[in-house]
Amino acid sequence: MVAFTVDQIRSLMDKVTNVRNMSVIAHVDHGKSTLTDSLVQRAGIISAAKAGEARFTDTRKDEQERGITIKSTAISLFSEMSDDDVKDIKQKTDGNAFLINLIDSPGHVDFSSEVTAALRVTDGALVVVDTVEGVCVQTETVLRQSLAERIKPVVVINKVDRALLELQVSKEDLYQSFSRTVESVNVIISTYADEVLGDVQVYPQRGTVAFGSGLHGWAFTVRQFANRYSKKFGVDREKMMDRLWGDSYFNPKTKKWTNKERDADGKPLERAFNMFVLDPIFRLFAAIMNFKKEEIPVLLEKLEINLKGDEKELEGKNLLKVVMRKFLPAADALLEMIILHLPSPVTAQNYRAEQLYEGPSDDPACIAIKNCDPKSDLMLYVSKMVPTSDKGRFYAFGRVFAGTVKSGQKVRIQGPNFIPGKKEDLFIKAIQRAVLMMGRFVEPIDDCPAGNIIGLVGIDQFLLKTGTLTTFEGAHNMKVMKFSVSPVVQVAVEVKNANDLPKLVEGLKRLSKSDPCVLVSMSESGEHIVAGTGELHLEICLQDLENDHAGIPLKISPPVVAYRETVEGESSQTALSKSPNKHNRIYLKAQPIDEEVSLAIEGGKINPRDDFKARARIMADEFGWDVTDARKIWCFGPDGNGPNLVVDQTKAVQYLNEIKDSVVAAFQWATKEGPIFGEQMRSVRVNILDVTLHADAIHRGGGQIIPTMRRATYAGFLLAEPKIQEPVFLVEIQCPEQAIGGIYSVLNKKRGQVVSEEQRPGTPLFTVKAYLPINESFGFTGELRQATGGQAFPQMVFDHWATLGTDPLDPSTKAGEIVLAARKRQGMKEEVPGWQEYYDKL
């Protein structure tokens, strides 16, 4: 236990080589917070008696009630290593005291935006996997996100006590189950890893995988056991580590190692991992759980475990907890693994800099980030806002990448839309004070050097959710985070009492600040719309809104899903539109964009900010576009980064560049609100074929061009077999065999389609994967639990947009019904306007 003072932490912050910033990531309910507890307990913040129950990082009341983590929280831990261990660290270190900034992040799929925010400020990740359930859909999503941010993973296989007590497996089965889990993690890592990182796969024999039980508070790595045995037998530790995993066997008769399963006489040999690592654990479990009073003291003496007075009276599970905690304390194994195998900021920023920074890789800011230099200009990324204890104020939570941040320092606050050299989205203000985040508490601190995680007070009015703070005039922004989920479920919110309206508006502002993945907007009919990533996410957001941010009673409409409008074919004739003064004409056609191009745009692979030549090269090589077309992409829409494109295919038009801005503005408007029912367009490419313009500049201003281009876009769109797309969830359901029938019946009722069904080897559980339209997903969890007697656990994550095959313009079809309902709700005319309304005759 360490009694911390802020000064001690501050002095550690200066030795950046000894800092580790890491997050804990996992599938929901695989035990992140419980494991985090055993670490926190060592750092001396919660008392030993409460660990395992305290779930220290779940700071919110609803987290403690629901037993899930919703927001990610940060804590600093302190650890000292012995000199032998420090020698094994492959990077530069200074002394043997280490500061670990740990962020516990939610595992529930609806909150993966929180995970993204946590990942941005860390360099390493502790991936927690359940022994029994193995790698699940969310483990994969989060691992993929972290590898895209160039974050190095280490793995903990948790809940080993379940395998021993509930499933009563044999040693060999347990080994096989471990090795399968490690293999499936490595498959994901090798699929998504970045070459820059080198080999980041995890290997038990190198000590990058730990095994343990968060609830009982014990864990071990192969390295720890190798340590014990190398002292006992006088062998080299490195050699011992290699032998304690994989196909290596020890023959006790000949005292020799072999890699064959049988000895010379054909008798089976026991695998070294089972014999040296699992055997003592299995024996302890057997002796204690079967109440063998005489064996216990003998075993404890052999393993050098000393029980105190009243601990000798315990029996059964309580004794097991105490003994295992003394034999293999979880914190030792995890801290050792974190310190040995995760990179320090100095190491990590070297290869992460170009991915974090938007500007050129040779400007002073980027070089300072690369070197993690505390003396250069400040570069700080704010990844999220954390609500303070007094209503309505937020701490900005972020990481210093270069320079030193001080209380009272004047900084440039750059929002996500800031462009160097321009004034918009830029404030120059002083930071009131800096604070250390410690789970439920904060400690004020004077300054904080590069490589550390910090909270700032007094800049929450100037930033919406994320942004860059800097003191360097020419600095570009740090790159914006890519979220793996998109807000697709929306509700309309009204106040019950009209006098409360200003409070609601204020509350919505705060809500959108506190959650990185909520969209708050206002519809034309004056409704306030809140969009989230799924049912649970929305429920929590609205609960926050009602209780904290606005503090007033609300009326909430049933949830509605966001659709997209798209086209299937090319326009059947050229769409022509004339300007209001009849002096300008625009001719264009619409056509669909391939799904993979749309995905590449949404995933940021094809980026509107990239150099147009480089972008054209990618589109030509990978997606088969014509190079001249790819170079002449005028813009992406909506919002300047969506999956719709304007391509200029005109030949020798006079004054064309003067109207480019107006055309782009009109396209943004048209794609944000399509003609069918006012939803965004997706995968629509508009080719401008010809433009006739008036010779005088005054007759071709924005007021003439913008409405014309919008009408032409609509006409071209409606001529090109318009369709609508609905969002689809990928559902992963884990259940025992007898519950499968119930799952299928619920899925069939909800237009779901099953993609795969497989049994997890060595367990009675089946995993069913299916696609479920989000529109049908409301109340799905409840119905599923009813149909299966509460045995099935669904995990839903947004997967893709699926085009509805039927014609949205015909009210008798499925798509037409959706369109009609949406138009009624928004107070539009009931029938969709025909293309003739937007088309002008010559």
Curated annotation (Swiss-Prot):
Residues where GTP binds: 26-33, 158-161, 213-215
Does the record bear Cytoplasm in its keywords?
A: yes
Q: Which GO terms describe its cellular component?
A: cytosol; ribonucleoprotein complex
Q: Where, by residue number, does the polypeptide cross the bilayer? A: none
Where located?
Answer: Cytoplasm
Q: Tell me the domain of life.
A: Eukaryota
Domain tr-type G: start-end pairs: 17-253
Hydrolase among the record's keywords? yes
Q: Which residues carry this modification: Diphthamide?
A: 699
What SUPFAM superfamilies does the record point to? EF-G C-terminal domain-like (SSF54980), P-loop containing nucleoside triphosphate hydrolases (SSF52540), Ribosomal protein S5 domain 2-like (SSF54211), Translation proteins (SSF50447)
Q: Which GO terms describe its molecular function?
A: GTP binding; GTPase activity; ribosome binding; translation elongation factor activity
Q: Which InterPro entries match?
A: EFG_II, EFG_III/V, EFG_V-like, EFTu-like_2, G_TR_CS, P-loop_NTPase, Ribosomal_Su5_D2-typ_SF, Ribsml_uS5_D2-typ_fold_subgr
Give the catalytic activity. Answer: GTP + H2O = GDP + phosphate + H(+)
PROSITE patterns hit by this protein: G_TR_1 (PS00301), G_TR_2 (PS51722)
> What Pfam families is this protein classified in?
EFG_C, EFG_III, EFG_IV, GTP_EFTU, GTP_EFTU_D2
Q: Which UniProt keywords apply?
A: Cytoplasm, Elongation factor, GTP-binding, Hydrolase, Nucleotide-binding, Protein biosynthesis
Q: What is its EC number?
A: 3.6.5.-
Q: Which family does it belong to?
A: Belongs to the TRAFAC class translation factor GTPase superfamily. Classic translation factor GTPase family. EF-G/EF-2 subfamily.
The record describes the protein's role as:
Catalyzes the GTP-dependent ribosomal translocation step during translation elongation. During this step, the ribosome changes from the pre-translocational (PRE) to the post-translocational (POST) state as the newly formed A-site-bound peptidyl-tRNA and P-site-bound deacylated tRNA move to the P and E sites, respectively. Catalyzes the coordinated movement of the two tRNA molecules, the mRNA and conformational changes in the ribosome.
- The molecule here is called Elongation factor 2
Q: Which gene encodes it?
A: EFT1
